[in-house]
């Protein structure tokens, strides 16, 4: 049985936003306070995140998540990526590296923005002092396994940057975001 927790579903600035507040949303409705995009899943014994929003620390605290095996990135916009540094806390708790999966284009952006977080496999690093994220690039439409989890990355169309969707275990769970066409 899969477990899926939506950590955030708000737009890039979150809801309420600094500029527009709640907009058309009712501020009295608790569900209208929305953190930025993020999803946690447990599938086939794998604990994974989709994206790391700037709200990641609070998302993990509020959902009592203290272990992550892998992170799958949809794209390299700040609202989906810039909480990546908070993964150091997971490294400290578990004492091990986290696998990071992204398209070659998005992985290149991550390496450029956050070089201090990337550790090549086999490199000896103490995760208490430094994050340990192992980079893994994939090809679209080519399935691969991470442990017992089958992953098929798909390229989404219509966003202003390359965006990835994921099919897990032949459709047991599918995650897509920020797209206009598939």
Describe these PLM feature segments.
Residues 1-174, 180-182:
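Binuclear metal-dependent hydrolase catalytic cores
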């Amino acid at each position: 049985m899969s477990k899926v927790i939506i950590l955030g579903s708000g737009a890039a600035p979150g809801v309420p936003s600094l500029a527009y507040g709640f907009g058309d949303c009712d501020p009295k409705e608790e569900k209208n306070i929305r953190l930025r995009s993020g999803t946690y899943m447990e599938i086939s014994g794998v604990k994974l995140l989709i994206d790391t929003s700037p709200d990641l620390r609070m998302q993990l605290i509020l959902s009592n998540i203290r272990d992550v095996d892998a992170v799958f990135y949809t794209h390299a916009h700040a609202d989906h990526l810039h909480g990546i540094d908070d993964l150091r806390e997971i490294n400290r708790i578990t004492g091990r590296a986290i696998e990071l999966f992204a398209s070659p284009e998005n992985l290149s952006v991550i390496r450029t923005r956050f070089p201090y977080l990337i550790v090549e496999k086999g490199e000896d690093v103490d995760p208490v002092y430094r994050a340990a994220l192992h980079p893994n690039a994939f090809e679209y439409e080519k399935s691969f396994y991470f442990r017992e989890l089958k992953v098929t990355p798909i390229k989404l169309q219509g966003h202003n940057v390359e965006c990835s969707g994921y099919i897990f275990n032949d459709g047991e769970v599918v995650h897509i975001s920020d797209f206009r066409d598939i």
